[in-house]
Swiss-Prot record:
One of its GO terms (molecular function) is magnesium ion binding. The gene is rnhA. Binds 1 Mg(2+) ion per subunit. May bind a second metal ion at a regulatory site, or after substrate binding. Its EC number is 3.1.26.4. This is Ribonuclease H.
Length: 146
């Protein structure tokens, strides 16, 4: 299973969206959504959460994000945060703890291999996830305007 995720925010904080591209054995599924008042980091985390929550059963997932915050958070920083009672090395509360806890549980359910790609560098699936994240914002705003 392959997943590409992206988050977007217009203003930070501001309206935000998330996008996911899932691919398995030649089949592709896309997901997207938006929130009226959020941050870019929350949308990046939400995209990864939505990708993993969409999977019906535990599996091996190669998840690619353009967010170092997400990749490093889950692969490097998480163990220390948990050891310190969800505090950073500076003893401050971990931002977005609610989402990190959800992502941690999903990361334990699946065998996730975390990959990073530079955003807006022409990587096709990352660009698709970015377009979906922006569609999430657009559709949310259009729905609110009617």
């Amino acid at each position: 299973m392959y997943a590409w995720t992206d988050g977007a925010c217009r203003g930070n904080p501001g309206p935000g969206g998330w996008g996911v591209v899932l691919r398995y054995r030649g089949h592709e599924r896309t997901l997207h959504g938006g929130e009226p008042h959020t941050t870019n980091n929350r949308m990046e985390l939400t995209a990864a959460i939505q990708a993993l929550e969409a999977l019906d059963r535990p599996c091996v997932v190669h998840l690619t994000t353009d967010s170092q915050y997400v990749r490093k958070g889950i692969t490097e920083w998480m163990a220390g945060w948990k050891r310190r009672g969800w505090r950073t090395a500076a003893r401050k509360p971990v931002l977005n703890e609610d989402l990190w806890r959800r992502l941690d549980a999903l990361n334990q359910r699946h065998e996730v291999h975390w990959h990073w790609v530079r955003g807006h560098s022409g990587h096709a699936e990352n660009e698709q996830a970015d377009a979906l994240a922006n569609r999430g914002i657009d559709e949310m705003q259009e729905a609110g305007a009617t």
